[in-house]
């Protein structure tokens, strides 16, 4: 049977390889944008960026500015909504700076409520979805590979299997993604793959990459241009 394939030429390419259909020429291309106002600076600047056109510094409308990095402090980033960058190396640096600005400077493990944590792996049996933000409380270091914590979603609903006393069981969370913020090891995840299969995976979410941000929305964002 014929298959109708829809694609978005403005979507970020996969981290590895090519998109399944994007290497082929489309039969039809939709070019007129209806989702946002035609005069939206977001649409205009996004189109310029995709076409490789330079975007100067300054204010483009009531909602959009391009600022120099030296003019934006970690404290301002904390008040600016979600920070989005291109590279993982940038993400690690921004997370460290924003954690310090928020007062979480002791060690690389999350300390509990107030930390911005993002889930990195689907666990349908627990109600965890890759990309969702969660809150950790009562964090306990359990050894070399993981720590445990009670976990709630953004609405405050508990996450985990119900326990015998009516409360929800603590989750065991893989340390590696947090430890990468102070001692990056490119072989860590290959080395730990077998053990971490049964662990929850999460990391600091003060700053996230554009790939991780796809499909989400925020009231305000700061896009950190790192040349990706």
State where each predicted segment sits:
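Short, intrinsically disordered, charge-balanced linker/junction segments flanking boundaries
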Residues: 1, 15, 226-228
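C-terminal accessory regions
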Residues: 147-228
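Conserved helicase motor core of P-loop NTPases
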Residues: 3-169
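A generic hydrophobic-helix recognition signal that picks specific residues
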Residues: 1, 80, 205-208
């Amino acid at each position: 049977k014929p298959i109708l394939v829809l694609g978005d030429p403005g979507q970020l390419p996969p981290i590895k390889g090519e998109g399944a259909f994007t290497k082929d020429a489309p039969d039809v291309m939709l070019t007129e944008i209806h989702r946002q106002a035609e005069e939206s600076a977001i649409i205009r600047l996004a189109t310029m960026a995709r076409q490789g056109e330079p975007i100067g510094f300054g204010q483009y409308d009531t909602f959009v500015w391009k600022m120099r990095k030296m003019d934006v402090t970690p404290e301002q980033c904390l008040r600016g909504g979600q920070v989005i960058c291109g590279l993982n190396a940038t993400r690690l640096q921004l997370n460290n700076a924003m954690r310090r600005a928020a007062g979480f400077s002791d060690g690389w493990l999350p300390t509990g409520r107030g930390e911005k944590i993002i889930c990195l792996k689907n666990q349908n049996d627990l109600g965890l979805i890759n990309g969702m933000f969660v809150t950790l409380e009562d964090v306990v270091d359990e050894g070399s590979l993981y720590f445990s914590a009670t976990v709630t979603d953004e609405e405050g609903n508990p996450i985990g299997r119900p326990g015998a006393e009516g409360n929800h069981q603590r989750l065991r969370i893989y340390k590696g993604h947090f430890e990468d913020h102070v001692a990056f090891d490119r072989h860590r995840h290959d080395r730990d793959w077998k053990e971490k299969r049964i662990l929850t995976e999460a990391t600091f979410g003060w700053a996230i990459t554009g790939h991780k941000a796809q499909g989400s929305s925020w009231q305000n964002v700061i896009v950190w241009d790192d040349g990706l």
